[in-house]
Amino acid sequence: MEKILEVQGLKKTFKLSAKQQKIEKTKTKVKVAVNDLSFTAYRGEVFGLLGPNGAGKTTTLRMLATLIRPEAGDAVLDGSSIVKEPEEVRGKIGFLTSELKLEEFFTPNYLFDFFADLHKVPASEKKQRRERLFERFGIDRFAEVKVGNLSTGMKQKVSLVISMVHDPDVIIFDEPTNGLDVLTAKVVTDFLLDLKSQGKTIIVSTHIFSLIEKICDRVGIIIDGRMVMCDSLEAVCNGKTLEDRFFELYEETVSSGSLGAEGGKEN
């Protein structure tokens, strides 16, 4: 298998305000969001990051997408370093997160044109890609409607289409079905499976077990900013359901006091 993403020792901390310290129930002024995180993803696979809220999944994907810079470590994506060559990385990936909001006074058409031009997509390809993606997600009827007047599900569809405007080979999705109704979530999941069939590499974070089981080839379980296990879905489950295996690993990790032993376990 050909490596397309190699993550080595990523670390990221954040300062906590007094209010955040109260919420976190800690006197510590610094939160370690990601701590010595390493894993590998291979070309054409769907790799899932599974963990509870606050485990460091979103921070990890934001570092991979070069939105924030790691304090230590690096990741090489298709030959480009996220630390040394962030602009090259941005040109190779599509990135979707529900936490990045679209400007509500722009229309889907305007946003598609803006990002297509930003990625220097040729006019002929832009037209064909817009028609195909807008029709696929039912956006064509809302192409000139301001984003602020769209439903939550339609906004997520527009965000998804924009992340694919330049037809990237590597797509990073942070909680892609978060907050969506079941019908829209199915549309998004089916699209991920379609991308998988096209040979795209997908890195996806979620806390939804069924999504991992449905689309992922390999999974990394992340707890408290550390990778506690990383392997094929079959090997991680070890004859059990993913949910049962996750909570088993979680209890083992908490009871051992290690919260993700140094470097994690990857096969």
Predicted regions and their residues:
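Conserved ABC transporter NBD signature motif
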Residues: G73-K84, E88-V89
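Catalytic Walker B motif of ABC-type/P-loop ATPase nucleotide-binding domains
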Residues: I171-E175
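Conserved ABC ATPase "signature" region
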Residues: D113, D117, S124-F142
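Conserved ABC ATPase signature
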Residues: K146-L150
